[in-house]
């Protein structure tokens, strides 16, 4: 008989999405499932929908609890699971019908206890999903022992987005429970990575499939990076310190691991600084300057910047040089120019594609809301190969 796989789904005010999510799990080719829906004190009709779904399928168990956040909901779900394997899904996403089967097959075939799949990023729709040719795609992208994986952890953090989330992974339940691995409940951002990092301590190997088995639905295209996160720097520093300690403990904090993790952290520090210019930030200009000064003078930041000399774009390099010289006022002034300059004049911006856009330019959409009251126009000049076009935004 197939091993039992437990799927934990935290639910909070997801009445628009939860049915599609759970239905996609119920339709799995792999049938031996335990689906645990953890209602985290929802104020909409999500609890009722969850209960109705449980009446339709005996594999579904619903837990209702007071609101405590996504980490709390996942931890409660972990306490209830009885399966051999453990997986997670977010209530506003949907999964491919082979999501569970392929992950289990890889775990059993390669005898590893951590399997990772890739995913699709879908904006506001379930319609743009192209069926996968599973016969062609069922090959691992790579397979590594845990020691091999430790040696490339910095690279995986920096260049592989599959490292951070829990929903594209298959875990062994006994490892999670025996070592009391939980999601930190005192973090608003990045808690998933700390769970994964703790699990890596005890896994024997890691494998990744190229199949995009998970569909990550972005309900608001601006929500991923445009939200103001007051504790972004503190959370990112916590992740960096945890990863650095992990590398030191396993004697792999050297070579490219050092440069890659330093580059990862430096980019997050820059994001934290730019985040201070969000229109939701209620700090005064003086307090914002002081906060930027605190970030730039942080010892961890200074160390990371000194090693992060690889892969940098021109603007990143410019800001990195300023950070190394602790020129925090110049950083503040330069970022202020990015923000204020758009309000006062057209911005002609040249880039080949979004991935290669200068770092600060990625954040220009943050200013769109703030300039509406000025009635100004922004002209974007986008270049893709030899094709050029202008976009006017009001």
Residue ranges and their predicted role:
Residues 211-220, 226-252, 268-303:
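Catalytic core of nucleotide-sugar-dependent glycosyltransferases
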Residues 86:
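Short aromatic/hydrophobic "clamp" motif used to bind/position activated sugar donors
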Residues 91-233, 237, 250:
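Donor-binding/catalytic cores of nucleotide-activated saccharide
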Residues 25, 40-41, 54, 68, ...:
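Conserved short acidic donor-positioning loop in nucleotide-sugar-dependent glycosyltransferases
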């Amino acid at each position: 008989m197939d091993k039992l796989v437990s799927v934990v789904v935290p639910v909070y005010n997801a009445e628009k999405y939860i049915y599609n999510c759970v239905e996609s799990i119920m339709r799995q080719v792999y049938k031996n499932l335990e689906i645990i829906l953890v209602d985290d004190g929802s104020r909409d009709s999500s609890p009722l929908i969850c209960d109705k779904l449980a009446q339709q399928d005996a594999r579904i168990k619903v837990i209702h609890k007071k609101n405590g956040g996504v980490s709390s909901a996942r931890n409660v779900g972990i306490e209830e699971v009885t399966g051999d394997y453990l997986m997670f899904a977010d209530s506003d996403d949907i999964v491919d019908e082979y999501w569970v089967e392929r992950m289990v097959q890889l775990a059993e075939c390669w005898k590893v206890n951590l399997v990772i799949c890739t995913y699709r990023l879908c904006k506001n729709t379930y319609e743009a999903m192209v069926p996968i040719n599973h016969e062609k795609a069922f090959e691992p992208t790579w397979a590594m022992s845990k020691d091999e994986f430790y040696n490339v952890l910095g690279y995986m953090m920096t260049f592989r987005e599959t490292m951070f989330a829990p929903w594209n992974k298959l875990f062994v339940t006994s490892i999670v429970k025996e070592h009391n691995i939980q999601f930190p409940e005192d973090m608003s951002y990045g808690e998933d990575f700390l769970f994964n990092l703790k699990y890596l301590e005890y896994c024997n190997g890691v494998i990744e499939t190229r199949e995009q088995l998970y569909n990550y639905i972005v309900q608001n295209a601006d929500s991923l990076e445009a939200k103001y996160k007051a504790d972004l720097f503190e959370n990112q520093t916590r992740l960096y310190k945890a990863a650095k300690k992990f590398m030191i403990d396993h004697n792999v904090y050297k070579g490219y691991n050092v440069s890659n993790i330093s580059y990862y952290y430096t980019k997050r520090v820059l994001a934290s600084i730019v985040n201070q210019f969000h229109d939701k930030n209620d700090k005064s200009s003086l307090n914002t300057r002081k906060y930027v000064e605190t970030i730039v003078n942080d010892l961890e930041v200074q160390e990371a910047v000194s090693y992060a000399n690889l892969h940098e774009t021109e603007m990143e390099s410019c800001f990195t040089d300023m950070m190394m010289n602790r020129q925090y006022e110049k950083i503040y002034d330069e970022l202020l120019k990015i923000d204020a300059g758009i309000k006062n004049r057209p911005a002609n911006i040249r880039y080949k594609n979004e991935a290669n856009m200068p770092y600060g330019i990625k954040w220009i959409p943050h200013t769109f809301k703030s300039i509406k009251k000025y009635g100004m126009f922004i002209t974007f000049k986008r270049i893709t190969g030899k094709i050029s076009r202008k976009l006017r935004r009001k």
